[in-house]
């Protein structure tokens, strides 16, 4: 009888331990933790503004309801933070990105990028475009987008940029080169805020911003005050191969529409193919979210679920509309990974041409 009692008691203890372990396993990964959202540009830019809106809602949607704080790490055209999250940040699931661009550095084999972005566990991407605007007093005077062809001296139309292999710099150079507009690229600015200040002080005459900055910063401070006018926004490249305008930017021509207005036909050639290559990624992951390589599967899964909820969340959408002036369009992490593989592996002709073009830009006496 004692033997039977001991056996039953032992089974009860084992069962209790098993049940307790299950309870522990069921505890949400992020319960009681703090997450740092790393932003690769300075405060005030589109990446910063969009990241802070997400950070306000992520704790509510992420299982375990952790604290989420934002940390800006600008530098090297966004590269400092990109290298940091893959090289230095602990793979414990507690550092998540809200990066702007970055993938072009790998597409073009920039040695400053020391990591392989395809090894990152991608969480989500946010698609979008950029709007290029210019000072109205650019010689001989700009009243409408087509007036940019009136510029006769490249140094009268200086365009601010960050890094020659960065998305912003490449797209602007390619576009104005394709359009046949005289221009003078000025690279090396440390972030959007300093670039805008340079434009306000007439050190440069043109710059490009995302919609996150356009609606809430540029329109009230530069467009409505008659300092600048919008020149174009980048086309949306659709899955069927067509291009279209972004519906929330009425009255601002796309690159293809502006080209057609001037030349009477759609753009073609290697510049256009390179713009398509870059903007196809930008249209799905102008902002991109990842964790450090080697992060726990539980963290990756929980974060992906949270971003999936975020994309449909009414409170987030309302906040985004109020804070950014538009509602971001999300794509899932699997789509981001596929796009990266496509860009890196299936476009060798465009990639090689653009690498050669960048070498020409470096040698050109502007």
Which ranges hold each PLM region?
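Ligand-binding "clamshell"
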Residues: 107-121, 181-184, 217-236, 241-266, ...
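An extracytoplasmic/periplasmic, membrane-proximal ligand-sensing/linker region
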Residues: 31-32, 224-230, 240, 250, ...
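Short, low-complexity disordered leader/linker segments with a strong preference
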Residues: 1-32, 360-366
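Hinge/capping helix and adjacent helix->loop/strand transition within the periplasmic-binding protein
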Residues: 29, 60-65, 84-95, 106-206, ...
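Paired acidic/hydrophobic, glycine-rich loop segments that form the ligand-binding mouth/hinge
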Residues: 92-99, 204-211, 229-231
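Extracytoplasmic "Venus flytrap"
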Residues: 37-52, 74-77, 160-167
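Early extracytoplasmic/lumenal segment of secretory-pathway proteins
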Residues: 66-83
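Short, well-ordered beta-strand elements
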Residues: 33-42, 68-71, 95-96, 156-161
């Amino acid at each position: 009888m004692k033997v039977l009692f001991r056996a039953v008691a032992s089974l009860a203890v084992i069962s209790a331990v098993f049940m307790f372990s299950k309870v522990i396993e069921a505890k949400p990964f992020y319960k009681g933790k703090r997450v740092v959202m790393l932003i690769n540009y300075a405060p005030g830019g589109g990446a910063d503004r969009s990241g802070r809106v997400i950070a306000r809602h992520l704790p509510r949607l992420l299982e375990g309801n952790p604290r989420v704080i934002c940390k800006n790490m600008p530098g090297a055209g966004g590269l400092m933070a990109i290298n940091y999250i893959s090289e230095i940040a602990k793979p414990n699931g507690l550092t998540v990105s809200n990066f702007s661009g970055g993938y072009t550095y790998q597409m073009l084999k920039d040695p400053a990028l020391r990591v392989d972005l395809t090894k990152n566990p991608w969480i989500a991407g946010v698609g979008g475009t950029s709007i290029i605007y210019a000072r109205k007093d650019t010689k001989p005077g700009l009243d409408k987008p087509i007036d940019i062809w009136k510029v006769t001296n490249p140094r009268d139309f200086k365009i601010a940029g960050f890094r020659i292999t960065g998305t912003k710099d490449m797209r602007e150079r390619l576009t104005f080169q394709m359009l046949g507009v005289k221009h003078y690229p000025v690279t090396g600015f440390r972030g959007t805020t300093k670039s805008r200040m340079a434009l306000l002080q007439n050190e440069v005459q043109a710059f490009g911003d995302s919609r996150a900055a356009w609606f809430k910063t540029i329109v009230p401070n530069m467009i409505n005050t008659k300092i600048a006018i919008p020149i174009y926004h980048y086309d949306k490249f659709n899955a069927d191969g067509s291009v279209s305008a972004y519906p929330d930017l009425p009255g601002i021509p796309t690159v293809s529409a502006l080209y057609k207005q001037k030349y009477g036909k759609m753009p073609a050639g290697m510049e256009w193919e390179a713009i398509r290559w870059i903007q196809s990624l930008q249209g799905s992951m102008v902002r991109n979210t990842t964790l450090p390589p080697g992060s726990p599967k539980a963290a990756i899964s929980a974060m992906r679920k949270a971003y999936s909820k975020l994309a449909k969340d009414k409170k987030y959408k309302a906040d985004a509309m109020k804070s950014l002036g538009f509602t971001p369009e999300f794509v899932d992490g699997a789509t981001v990974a596929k796009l990266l593989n496509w860009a890196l592996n299936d476009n060798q002709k465009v990639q090689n041409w653009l690498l050669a073009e960048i070498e020409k830009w470096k040698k050109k006496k502007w």
